[in-house]
Curated annotation (Swiss-Prot):
Subcellular localization, as worded in the UniProt entry: Host cytoplasm; Host nucleus
Protein known as: Protein PA-X
GO BP terms in the entry: viral RNA genome replication; viral translational frameshifting
Site (Important for efficient shutoff activity): 202-203, 206
Active site positions, chain numbering: 80, 108
Domain notes: The probable endonuclease active site in the N-terminus and the basic amino acid cluster in the C-terminus are important for the shutoff activity. The C-terminus acts as a nuclear localization signal. The C-terminus is recruited to host protein complexes involved in nuclear Pol II RNA processing.
Gene expressing this chain: PA
Site label Important for efficient shutoff activity and nuclear localization, positions: 195, 198-199
InterPro entries to which the protein is assigned, alphabetical: PA/PA-X, PA/PA-X_sf
Length: 252
């Protein structure tokens, strides 16, 4: 699974996931399913914000190619992917500027158009079950929840899906692609089932053979949303754009 993650996700997403796990004392080489889940969640958050801007009239607009007009403002502030100190600094700044209620838990995004924090969920289970778990944890009507599954299902607070259908379809297609790629390599069952994951881990620890059948190339294209995480360690030039193929795994 670790090899799959490193070769099928953008290197910057992988690095952010590694930093997040190490911040909590977790090892990506051991907790490989969690490593994959974090990378998937990060990519979903970045794709959620990609191409979406607010014009000078305060209207939402989509710009998919080239540099956006200087008058346009990014619609979403990305909180997920930052270290906790920086993330809370961003949240506090937003709350002080907009007057919105400070959330109890760190959200994933802030929507400047709807003036609300957003919690993104990606689940391997039923969307309604995961939605209820998120809602019970957050316990705040101020934070908007949007759940995606690997089967193309989604669920959002008050059935308000925030994004246009095409933007959401990009995310759903990417998640379905990840599922297919995992399944083709015999990784999906262990990703879904903790019991199977433990069995696979024991098997992997016993084997010293290198993984075979994995893709040999990795996409180095950068999601525009990743660029907004500067000045952490990325440059501020938002030029690369995820297209319809957005970071598909390369097959041999």
């Amino acid at each position: 699974m670790e090899d799959f993650v490193r070769q099928c996700f953008n290197p910057m997403i992988v690095e952010l996931a590694e930093k997040a796990m190490k911040e909590y004392g977790e090892d990506p080489k051991i907790e490989t399913n969690k490593f994959a889940a974090i990378c998937t969640h990060l990519e979903a958050c970045f794709m959620y914000s990609d191409f979406h801007f607010i014009d000078e009239r305060g209207e939402s607009t989509i710009v998919e190619s080239g540099d956006p007009n200087a008058l346009l403002k990014h619609r979403f502030e990305i909180i997920e992917g930052r270290d906790r100190t920086m993330a809370w600094t961003v949240v506090n700044s937003i709350c002080n500027t907009t007057g919105v209620e400070k959330p109890k838990f760190l959200p994933d995004l802030y929507d400047y158009k709807e003036n609300r924090f957003i919690e993104i969920g990606v689940t391997r289970r039923e969307v309604h079950i995961y939605y209820l778990e998120k809602a019970n944890k957050i316990k705040s009507e101020k934070t908007h929840i949007h759940i995606f599954s690997f089967t193309g299902e989604e669920m959002a607070t008050k059935a308000d899906y925030t994004l246009d259908e095409e933007s959401r379809a990009r995310i759903k297609t990417r998640l379905f692609t990840i599922r297919q790629e995992m399944a083709s390599r015999g990784l999906w069952d262990s990703f879904v089932s903790p019991r199977e994951a433990k069995r696979q881990l024991k098997k992997d620890l016993k084997s010293q053979e290198p993984c075979v059948g994995l893709p040999t190339k990795v996409s180095h294209r950068t999601s525009p949303a990743l660029k907004t995480l500067e000045p952490m360690w990325m440059d501020s030039n938002r030029t690369a754009a995820l297209r319809a193929s957005f970071l598909k795994c390369q097959k041999k």
